[in-house]
């Protein structure tokens, strides 16, 4: 574990160098919240409630989603992994007793610590300005379930990015795969609109996909869009997806290394 802790420390140092990049992202997220305020304000102009929730609850949901992206979201980990494979940097991990997944997850964790910490500053500003509009439920169980839900969400998001990065073993360019993944994740992950506004059949189907658990599920727990029995059942589904994606990541790594060695990597 010491080597992965060292990787975490190195990741913290390197990400602090790029802290202004994260700060700009945080500032852009504030701009997005302004657009959300305007667009959803117009949507609620003709109705006091949509999908069973009022404007204040919807605004709170989007603020929580924007915040969680900086704490558990994958930014460019897929491209970083792809670059290491293309440049042959992956070879150094084949000669050392280091688990590449654990190493990259340590770097991912470091990046989220830095980005999440920087997000707290604009978040405090937004909360100060919109505190009269924010409606977070006070039930203690939401925090108790929210923490493991966020942990599994981070693992799922990283695992998906990791798998896309490993596709470089077969494809020289993965940008098309990543763009497609981002489009699906934004839609089925609840970043564009709360998923419970979808038709009932589509919403039910989305609950069995991993994208649902990337952002919507933890945000729905924290903002009161799920009751406790539903949250507990979906926590089991989220855990299952985390295990499945870990298995897929392991399979891609094993098969990818065989191909890498076969072509003289």
Model-identified regions with their sequence ranges:
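Hydrophobic transmembrane alpha-helices and immediately adjacent juxtamembrane helices
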Residues: 1-265
